[in-house]
C-alpha cells in the first residue's frame, strides 16, 4: 500500500464539567463528546522525506502540528526510516473547540499504522493518542461517548440524530489559557453531564438541548463576549438549546426544525467568520484505501 486517504471528523461537547486540576497539570473532567460531520480530509503517501502540505485553514508548523508530532513519535518508536507526504484539506477551523488538530492526529496514527505495516493493537493506538493530546483517543473512535479522567476513559452512548448549526466568531481560543483562568477564578462546575447522559439514554433531544452546558463558557465568554450574543441569536432563531464546544469559541445550536435551521444559517453566514450546518454521526474517522 502506497497511499491512504482518511476523513477526520470534528467533535462537540454536549456537556463539559471541570472537576479539578491533577498533579500532572491536566484537569479532571466529565464530558459527553459527540462526533459531527464536519471533517478534514488527509491523504498519506509513502516518501523518502516527511512533508505536510495544507490547503484551507492555516495550521501550525513543526512539533506544534500534531500530524508532525505523531509522525516523529512513530518513526522513533518503531525505528522507521522512510518518510511520508501528507496532504491536508483543512475544513475544521483552528483553535475553535472542535478538536480539529486532535482529529488529524488520530487520522495520522491510523493511516501510518497501515502505510508502514506497524500492526498496532487498539490499546497501542490509544496509548499513543493520549501522549499526543487529551482529545485524540476520542477522535480515534468517535461517535457519542461519556468521557472521564482527562477525556480518555470512555462509556459508549447512543444519541438520537440531531441537526446542528455551528457558529464561530473570528477569534482563536487556546485551551491552556482558558483552563489556567478557570483555576485562577475558582469557578465551580455546573455538573451538567449526568443530566445530559440521562436525556441521551431516554432518546429525548428536547431534554438534551435543555441540559447542554459547558463550564468553560464561564471563562471564554469573558474573553469573547460575542459568545453570549451568538447563543441569544441562535435561540431567537429557533434553536432548542445551545452551548459552546470545548474551550471555544465555537457555539452550536440544536434544532428540531430544519427550515428554521436553514433560515438561521442564511441569516448568520454573512455575519460570522464560520457558520456550518452539521449533524451528529457515529464515527471519528473514515478510511479510503
From Swiss-Prot:
One of its GO terms (molecular function) is 4-(cytidine 5'-diphospho)-2-C-methyl-D-erythritol kinase activity. InterPro entries: GHMP_kinase_C_dom, GHMP_kinase_C_sf, GHMP_kinase_N_dom, IspE, Ribosomal_Su5_D2-typ_SF, Ribsml_uS5_D2-typ_fold_subgr. Disulfide bonds: none annotated. Keywords: ATP-binding, Isoprene biosynthesis, Kinase, Nucleotide-binding, Transferase. Its EC number is 2.7.1.148. One of its GO terms (biological process) is terpenoid biosynthetic process. Pfam families: GHMP_kinases_C, GHMP_kinases_N. ATP binds at residues 93-103. Pathway: Isoprenoid biosynthesis; isopentenyl diphosphate biosynthesis via DXP pathway; isopentenyl diphosphate from 1-deoxy-D-xylulose 5-phosphate: step 3/6. The active site is at 11, 135. It catalyses: 4-CDP-2-C-methyl-D-erythritol + ATP = 4-CDP-2-C-methyl-D-erythritol 2-phosphate + ADP + H(+). The keyword Iron-sulfur does not apply. Belongs to the GHMP kinase family. IspE subfamily. HAMAP family: IspE. Catalyzes the phosphorylation of the position 2 hydroxy group of 4-diphosphocytidyl-2C-methyl-D-erythritol. This is 4-diphosphocytidyl-2-C-methyl-D-erythritol kinase. It comes from Thermoanaerobacter sp. (strain X514). The gene is ispE.
